């Protein structure tokens, strides 16, 4: 069916306003709950996408320095006691660890997408590590 062009028409008074039902009128006239405004919430996934863009732009380390340092010292205790670390050595370890984790999560995401999912799961990480040859 062909579309027709609509033209503006002059109003001739129109209809009288309809009467509201009793329940609607009661709902509108009821006092509000103190005017408390609900906090704004973004749709699910919006904040996650914003964080992804923010972290992909940034170059700073994402793991906090002191907790990482404590973890390194704790693991090193198992091999030899009274080990000392230069701050640059801890920094180099942290750079390497974060680069490894970012790469692993990229591969994990590809595994999830291959399975037609958007959420990564434990089995995706296991598959990514298996394909890399890290885990038999």
From Swiss-Prot:
The keyword Acetylation applies. The modification N6-methyllysine is found at residues 5, 10, 19, 24, 28, 37, 80. Keywords: Acetylation, Chromosome, DNA-binding, Methylation, Nucleosome core, Nucleus, Phosphoprotein. Pfam families: Histone (PF00125). The nucleosome is a histone octamer containing two molecules each of H2A, H2B, H3 and H4 assembled in one H3-H4 heterotetramer and two H2A-H2B heterodimers. The octamer wraps approximately 147 bp of DNA. Core component of nucleosome. Nucleosomes wrap and compact DNA into chromatin, limiting DNA accessibility to the cellular machineries which require DNA as a template. Histones thereby play a central role in transcription regulation, DNA repair, DNA replication and chromosomal stability. DNA accessibility is regulated via a complex set of post-translational modifications of histones, also called histone code, and nucleosome remodeling. Belongs to the histone H3 family. This is Histone H3.1/H3.2. It comes from Lodderomyces elongisporus (strain ATCC 11503 / CBS 2605 / JCM 1781 / NBRC 1676 / NRRL YB-4239) (Yeast).
